[in-house]
């Protein structure tokens, strides 16, 4: 089965220097994939020619890449309202329009998160039964028994600062569907992020959401989960409001940077004698770093829309952006919006 994806080629901190090489690699590796690069035609064509020569991309592969002109770009610090109302020919807007028109099956952008969410919601609208879309991201999770690295899906990560219990319930359904499709499991475990595991703890919206989940046969509700267990493979989906989710995600990113800095500092300050066992342990460190490589987890989904939109990290490398493209392909294959719609009709 073939599939086509539009890419906001101008979006993100690095723009064409990330999106073009990522698109070329993805198309080269997947013969069923077609990509539409959306942006300033002259700039996109020039970058495409340059990178295709560097990567020695053959003509049959290049023939599966098209360019769609867009005269404007949404800045990373631009107001979502300005992006929606005034930049109707931005690379972001046009890429999403292609999803609405069914010219493509999905859109991937590394652009401004607020603008992407606002534009996607304005153009594509939400699925019936969904009040607000949510941002969901796959986090690395380690199973202490099997010693295997897995994924845990967490939502919302910033789209909705305040949520009702009904909205948290909707997020749980959407997250469960995504996890079931992505991880290939029939009944994904769903947990609510809370300050404790006891039933009486937490805000009213969380406790009321727990009651809704307990009464839903469709959801494999796993109770509350505390922040310290996010990376333990004890659940498949973690549900929270956008404020808590965004703060949690950025705290995780900061913690990883701190650990990396401390390791480097320790190595630099060690004596020559101490550096010998460190050098011997370098293969272990490299393997550990590979397992914690966030590039392999890039690609946040905007769930609850009538079409597929995947958000790449703004500062993503080409490898990381390529991962976001594969996330979009996965959602296309499982037709996530349609599956969510059908499931909501059964439980709401």
Curated annotation (Swiss-Prot):
Catalytic reaction equation(s): a fatty acyl-[ACP] + phosphate = an acyl phosphate + holo-[ACP]
Compartments where found: Cytoplasm
Gene Ontology BP annotations: fatty acid biosynthetic process; phospholipid biosynthetic process
Pfam families referenced in this protein's UniProt entry, alphabetically: FA_synthesis
Keyword Nucleotide-binding recorded: no
Keyword field: Cytoplasm, Lipid biosynthesis, Lipid metabolism, Phospholipid biosynthesis, Phospholipid metabolism, Transferase
Pathway, per record: Lipid metabolism; phospholipid metabolism
Cellular component, GO, one term: cytoplasm
Molecular function as annotated in GO: phosphate:acyl-[acyl carrier protein] acyltransferase activity
Assembly behavior: Homodimer. Probably interacts with PlsY.
Function: Catalyzes the reversible formation of acyl-phosphate (acyl-PO(4)) from acyl-[acyl-carrier-protein] (acyl-ACP). This enzyme utilizes acyl-ACP as fatty acyl donor, but not acyl-CoA.
NCBIfam families attached to this UniProt entry: plsX (TIGR00182)
Family: Belongs to the PlsX family.
Stated name of the protein: Phosphate acyltransferase
């Amino acid at each position: 089965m073939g599939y086509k994806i539009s890419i906001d080629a101008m979006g993100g901190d690095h723009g064409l220097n990330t999106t073009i090489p990522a698109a070329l690699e993805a198309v080269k590796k997947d013969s069923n994939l077609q990509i539409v690069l959306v942006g300033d035609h002259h700039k996109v064509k020039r970058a495409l020619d340059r990178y295709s020569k560097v990567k020695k991309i053959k003509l049959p592969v290049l023939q599966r890449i098209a360019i769609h002109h867009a005269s404007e770009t949404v800045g990373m610090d631009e107001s979502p309202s300005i992006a929606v109302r005034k930049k109707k020919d931005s690379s972001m807007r046009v890429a999403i329009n292609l999803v609405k028109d069914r010219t493509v099956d999905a859109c991937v952008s590394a652009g401004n998160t607020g603008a992407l969410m606002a534009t996607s919601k304005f153009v594509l609208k939400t699925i019936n039964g969904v009040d607000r879309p949510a941002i969901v991201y796959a986090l690395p999770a380690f199973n202490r028994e099997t010693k295997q690295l897995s994924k845990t899906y967490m939502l919302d990560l910033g789209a909705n600062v305040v949520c009702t219990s009904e909205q948290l319930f909707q997020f749980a359904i959407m997250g469960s569907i995504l996890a079931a499709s992505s991880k290939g499991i029939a009944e994904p475990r769903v947990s609510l992020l809370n300050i404790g595991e006891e039933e009486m703890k937490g805000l009213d919206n969380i406790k009321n959401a727990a009651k809704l989940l307990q009464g839903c046969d469709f959801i494999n509700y796993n109770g509350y989960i505390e922040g310290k267990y996010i990376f333990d493979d004890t659940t498949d989906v973690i549900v929270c409001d956008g404020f808590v989710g965004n703060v949690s995600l950025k705290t995780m990113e900061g913690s990883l940077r701190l650990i990396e800095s401390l390791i480097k500092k320790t190595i630099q300050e060690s004596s020559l004698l101490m550096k010998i066992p460190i050098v011997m342990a370098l293969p272990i460190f490299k393997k550990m770093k590979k397992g914690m490589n966030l590039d392999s987890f890039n690609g946040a989904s905007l769930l609850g829309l009538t079409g597929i939109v995947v958000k790449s990290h703004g500062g993503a490398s080409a490898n990381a952006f390529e991962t976001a493209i594969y996330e979009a392909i996965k959602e296309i294959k499982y037709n996530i919006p349609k599956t969510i719609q059908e499931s909501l009709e059964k439980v709401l």
